[in-house]
Amino acid sequence: MEPMLLLILVAAVVLLFVRWAFVYGHRTSNMPKGPPTLPFIGNIHQIPTQYTHIKFTEWAAKYGGLYMLKVGNGNMAVVTDRRLVKEVVDRKSGIYSHRPHSFVSHELITKGNHLLVMHYGDQWRTFRRLIHQHLMESMVDSQHVKIVNAEAIQLVRDYLVDPEHHMAHPKRFSNSITNSIVFGIRTADRNGSNMKRLYKLMEEWSEIMETGATPPVDLFPWMKMLPQWMFSNYVNRAKAIGVQMETLYTDILNKVIKRRNGGQNLGTFMDRVLDGQEKNDLPWHQLAFIGGVLMEGGSDTSSSLTIAIVQALILNPAVQKKAHAEIDAVVGSDRSPVWEDLEKLPYINMIIKEGHRWRPILPLCFPHALGEDDWVDGKLLPKGTVVVINTWGMHMDPSQPDDPAAFIPERYANHPQLAPEYAAGKWENRDHYGYGVGRRICPGIHLAERNMFLAIAKLLWAFEFQRGEGKIDSDPVTGYHNGFLYCAKDYPCRPVVRNKTIRATIEREFATATKEVFSQFTEG
């Protein structure tokens, strides 16, 4: 080959490589703006591995309510604008309801059977339809509220007799409600075996899904070929979590089937699903996962929010004082609050909404993925773009009248309704984004609203929450764990029962709940 021709070929290859380097990892001019990128990696080096919502909120202040990050050659759109959430993600939910593919989560752990990460399609629709039928508002009010009320009085009693383990009691409360409704198997105390297995599983899954815990194989598929020992044996660890997950779900399903074979059909969620198997024809692994997914979703969300609200109450005694006055005027000491008291206890509803806003359980909604190209405010979001809803950024919007960092329930004085009303309404009046957005909004929203009202109303009726020994760190970074869910680290708490009559009422109502409600269920 002639030297000149060889030189031309080499120059052409170099030019193509340079051009590719500047295209790969860079956004195009018709996309939303965002932080400066580097060739090949885009913005990967700038995305923190922990408390990502803090950085995303900083970028929103600089680049606006919709900006684009380049993750390798992939696209990530971050939405921190209430209008866009409604007009784009909600109203175009048919193309915004997909999930980004995850090799670790989809292929190694769940095999695509977990509703949280399940791709948008027929299986997802079947799961959502079955869940909706059992957790629609009318069903919750007619069948499930009595269980929630009973478990809430045990929650109060647990704080009374075992204040040392106050961080565990909300977990037992929410887990027992969910397991009773889904399987007919309640969690009688904080040492329940099913609950311990579940929280161990969720902790390990959360750890392996944290940014940086595994190689970025979804961005650079060639990294799957590298020996896994280079990355803490992530494949084996993920598969072990998957086995742990499937084993737990299957064990509990088998208990339901054994009970049914003995002639006991309790009308639980899984009883209804099994009754409809001739029509639904779910494979065995999907039967196990549909119940297990509900157990997961209902166990850690309400509990984490309850823990955050109790922390806020300790730090804001004036809020407690106002709540006590409202409850005393409506309820008194001879009974605890019930669901029917909701309209007469508006300040309790404000406290719960403020808890959702102040410390959202998911500061960043679980990522959506775009099913086709979309143009938003004149900017292109290509098909496959990962769409992140920055709940934290919207909740901490500095333009709101009151200090967003402060716990001020009164900011919701004009929001007397429950969250589903505002989620379906105008974006200007949305109360909070604690339950998600679009078609991926929490399917248990009606149950969760009742869980939270009865838990917080009864706890405030029963106790004055005082500081225990030691420091309370409510800082959104240093005071909170940041895994799958955003949860307060352990803090000291001293629940002081408000009077002798309330103490006697707690014991009386707990005895009634044990006899009339808890006796229906087995323990696990």
Swiss-Prot record:
Superkingdom, natural source: Eukaryota
Binding site for heme: 442
Regions crossing the membrane: 5-23
Biotech relevance: Patulin was originally used as an antibiotic and specifically trialed to be used against the common cold, but it is no longer used for that purpose since it has been shown to induce immunological, neurological and gastrointestinal effects. Genotoxic effects of patulin with dose-dependent increase in DNA strand breaks in brain, liver and kidneys have been detected in mice. However, more recently, it has been proposed that patulin might also have anti-tumor properties.
Pfam short name (any one): p450
Gene Ontology cellular component terms for the protein in this record: endoplasmic reticulum; endoplasmic reticulum membrane
Pathway: Mycotoxin biosynthesis; patulin biosynthesis
Lumenal side: 24-524
GO molecular function: heme binding; iron ion binding; monooxygenase activity; oxidoreductase activity, acting on paired donors, with incorporation or reduction of molecular oxygen
General function of this protein: Cytochrome P450 monooxygenase; part of the gene cluster that mediates the biosynthesis of patulin, an acetate-derived tetraketide mycotoxin produced by several fungal species that shows antimicrobial properties against several bacteria. PatH catalyzes the conversion of m-cresol into m-hydroxybenzyl alcohol. The pathway begins with the synthesis of 6-methylsalicylic acid by the polyketide synthase (PKS) patK via condensation of acetate and malonate units.
Family per record: Belongs to the cytochrome P450 family.
Identification of the protein by name: Cytochrome P450 monooxygenase patH
Lineage: Eukaryota, Fungi, Dikarya, Ascomycota, Pezizomycotina
